[in-house]
């Protein structure tokens, strides 16, 4: 039977936790191609709901969500689902290159994706746009990055030791990882993270 479990994840502002439902299929399957979005209204009268557009490209599927002046692009890498271990799982999606299973980029409606200050990288070691690196690590990690008023908040999981580089156009005035402040090591638009 189809079943679900409740999973705790960081909230959008990374200050607390929120619960989400993970649905599990009754049988093991080799490949599932699909994205499901369930949007619940805050009130019965709510009329302004997100606009969702289905998207796909070579070896990826995704969504573009427009809501309250922001665009969120969601990409699922169909080569990085765990079946191709030790194989190349790189994709090119809308100018981004990555080996991540999933990545999400959020940016204001009137700006370009390259100017985004919010990212999610799900089990990846690199995110690039052209020759510009936005994230680089020797280990595949889970990362949430949110930058506002030159304050960088990160949530990182996936390895006990982390050495990563994250793009930031200006040197942040503060950096926190998983709620803890860390020293700022910044050089040429790159923030070095060592845990």
Walk through the language-model features, giving the residues of each.
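CBM-like, beta-strand-rich accessory domains located in the C-terminal region of large
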Residues: 1-173, 177-195
């Amino acid at each position: 039977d189809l079943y679900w479990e409740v999973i705790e994840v960081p909230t959008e502002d990374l200050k607390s936790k929120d619960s989400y439902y993970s649905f599990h299929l009754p049988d093991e399957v080799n490949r599932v191609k699909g994205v499901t979005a369930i949007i619940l209204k805050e009130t019965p009268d709510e009329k302004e709901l997100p606009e969702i557009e289905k998207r796909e490209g070579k070896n990826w599927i995704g969504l573009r969500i427009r809501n309250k002046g922001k665009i969120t692009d969601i990409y699922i890498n169909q080569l990085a689902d765990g079946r191709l271990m030790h194989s190349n799982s790189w994709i090119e999606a809308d100018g981004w290159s990555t080996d991540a299973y999933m990545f999400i980029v959020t940016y204001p409606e009137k700006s370009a994706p390259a100017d985004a200050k919010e990212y999610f990288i799900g089990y990846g070691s690199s995110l690039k746009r052209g020759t510009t690196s936005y994230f680089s690590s020797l280990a595949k990690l889970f990362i949430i990055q949110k930058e506002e008023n030159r304050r960088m908040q990160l949530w990182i999981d996936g390895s006990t030791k982390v050495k990563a580089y994250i793009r930031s156009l200006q040197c942040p005035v503060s950096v926190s990882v998983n709620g803890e402040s860390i020293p700022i090591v910044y050089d040429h638009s790159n923030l070095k993270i060592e845990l």
